[in-house]
Curated annotation (Swiss-Prot):
It is found in: Cell inner membrane. Residues 11-223 form the ABC transmembrane type-1 domain. The gene is artQ. Residues 1-14, 70-98, 190-201 are periplasmic. GO terms for cellular component: ATP-binding cassette (ABC) transporter complex, substrate-binding subunit-containing; membrane; plasma membrane. This is Arginine ABC transporter permease protein ArtQ. The lineage of its organism: Bacteria, Pseudomonadati, Pseudomonadota, Gammaproteobacteria, Enterobacterales. PROSITE patterns: ABC_TM1. Residues 36-48, 120-168, 223-238 are cytoplasmic.
Amino acid sequence: MNEFFPLASAAGMTVGLAVCALIVGLALAMFFAVWESAKWRPVAWAGSALVTILRGLPEILVVLFIYFGSSQLLLTLSDGFTINLGFVQIPVQMDIENFDVSPFLCGVIALSLLYAAYASQTLRGALKAVPVGQWESGQALGLSKSAIFFRLVMPQMWRHALPGLGNQWLVLLKDTALVSLISVNDLMLQTKSIATRTQEPFTWYIVAAAIYLVITLLSQYILKRIDLRATRFERRPS
């Protein structure tokens, strides 16, 4: 029975990791969507290339790249290097004493990048689904472009994007299992530890599956409530 307390703590770590990645990922998704929609094509192509790379790589590789790449970056900054611009050379060096990187932070960064790569396409599609007439109506009312976007376009865009973003949240929850490879004490790592200690792997992995299922069902309920609230103006009164 004592084994359930570490599992409950690890489940909290999993949900916390997913929520942090969701918050950062949504901000990055909006940034990527704007980046890919830039009017200057080279800038838009650069954004599309980054999103394509993130979507094309296996999720496990992205997690490992961020984790080991962070350590390598700290070593490079500590050793120092020179940026040669031709007419001027810029030395770059930082005094770094601690080269340990936070597995939790690396997990959040990796998962948020993965979430943003897919969510940005959902946001772009949702933005295109808003009728152009909304912009024209806002201009007729004398609103500025920013006011039109935030007061007229964005609320409608989020309603279109909610189903897709909700599905990607469920995928994000499952992707949190990948961070066990970089020693984040999430549900999967704790389950593996308990299974090894008790020599009952099947039993404890079934328990972990049940916990993931409960989290998913709760997420679906919350997403349904959010969707009902967001679309309440579109439903006819009974």
